[in-house]
Regions:
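N-terminal glycine-/charge-rich "phosphate-binding" loop or analogous flexible N-terminal tail
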Residues: 1-42, 162-166, 302, 317-318
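Short, Asp-centered acidic motifs that coordinate Mg2+ and/or phosphate
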Residues: 43-44, 65, 196, 224, ...
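Phosphate/diphosphate ligand-binding glycine-rich loop within oxidoreductases
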Residues: 44-118
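Rossmann-like adenosine-cofactor binding region
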Residues: 51-57, 171-266
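Phosphate-binding beta-alpha-beta segment of Rossmann-like dinucleotide-binding domains, i.e.
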Residues: 86, 92-141, 156, 160, ...
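Rossmann-like dinucleotide-binding domain for NAD(H)/NADP(H)
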Residues: 88, 222-318
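Glycine-rich Rossmann-fold phosphate-binding loop(s) that bind the pyrophosphate
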Residues: 147-148
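N-terminal Rossmann-fold NAD(P) dinucleotide-binding loop
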Residues: 151-152
Length: 318
């Protein structure tokens, strides 16, 4: 019987799938290091955000496969798993719909002042509608920074709101961008024309602090920046300073650096920020599908039917 370790809360659908196939599936907490004492007995791992480093791998004497509960894998030390020839599988295009919807929700929340209006109605201030103006999305200019799976869906949704959609992706030739959108050749030019900027950039060390003081100072003082991608794309100190100085500038953040944010993080105290707890993909439907993808990656691997399109480190088989 193959033994599967699950670290972090995972939807029951995939776990039931594995148990029905006679796998032993153990769910352990990663809130402390006690799970490390048992690592040596498991053949497979389903992991969310737990750090899988050299210590982890060296303790996992029988580990044959890692199934990442997500698309990114910056919590996994690729070098050590390559050295041990342990395959790492991701889930593929499962979360693009909920994350793109969440992006639009943050944009709407900011434009329509939902959080502020809600708080004022609860304070019996119904007349706030006469003094505090929200905005239409129609005809507003939005820059989608990164045109991958999620960026494409966000672009389509923005079109439904009759927004002017601009696309920038340095890894994509301009002719790959549909003519229904406007391609941006140089990200440093004309940044001040945008009402919204939303980030959809995959993990890459070169992208760290991509949005810094220099970038922010080129934006309109009434722009809003949305990040449902990666916390480290934005220099939080620079963003904090910019938000404090420009009260009409807004941010919608689902991701932080580090996570969770410290309770003393000043972003949590600002009115011109909308915050969610890295929950964009955490819908019932998406979590069930993510769990099933992890389970199938494991069962397919042990049945010699692995889906190499979901395999991160293909070189271990070359």
């Amino acid at each position: 019987m193959k033994k599967v370790l699950v670290l972090g809360k995972v939807h029951s659908s995939g776990l039931k799938f594995l148990r029905d196939l006679s796998y032993q599936v153990d769910e352990l907490s990663d809130q402390d290091d006690s799970y490390k004492e048992k690592l040596n007995i498991y053949d497979a791992l389903i992991v969310k955000m737990t750090k899988v480093d050299s210590e982890f791998i060296n303790l996992s004497k029988n580990l044959q496969i890692i199934a990442r509960h997500g698309v990114g894998y910056n919590n996994v030390d690729i070098n050590i798993i390559n050295e041990k020839k342990i395959p790492l599988f991701i889930i593929g295009d499962v979360n693009s719909t909920p994350v793109s919807e969440h992006t639009i929700a943050l944009i709407l929340n900011i434009a329509k002042k939902i959080n502020y209006y809600d708080s004022q109605v609860r304070l019996d201030n119904f007349n706030v509608r006469n003094t505090f103006q929200s905005r239409d999305l129609s005809s507003k200019k939005i820059l989608i920074y990164g045109y991958g799976r999620i960026g494409k869906k966000v672009a389509q949704l923005c079109k439904f709101f009759n927004m002017e959609v601009y696309i920038y992706d340095k890894f994509l030739s301009l002719d790959k961008i549909p003519n229904t959108f406007k391609a941006v050749k140089n990200i440093e030019e004309n940044l001040d024309i945008f009402d919204f900027i939303t980030l959809h950039i995959p993990y890459n060390n070169s992208g760290r602090s991509l949005i810094d003081k220099s970038f922010l100072n080129k934006l309109s003082k009434e722009c809003s920046i949305i990040n449902t991608s990666r916390g480290d794309l934005i220099n939080e100190n620079d963003l904090l300073d910019h938000l404090k100085k420009n009260k009409n500038f807004n941010a919608g953040l689902d991701v932080f650096d580090p996570e969770p944010p410290s309770k003393n993080n000043e972003l949590l105290k600002l009115d011109n920020v909308v915050l969610t707890p890295h929950s964009a993909a955490y819908t019932e439907e998406c979590l069930a599908e993510m769990s099933m993808h992890c389970a199938k990656n494991i069962s397919d691997f042990f049945n010699n039917k692995m889906n190499k399109s979901l395999l991160v480190n293909k070189d271990i088989y070359s």
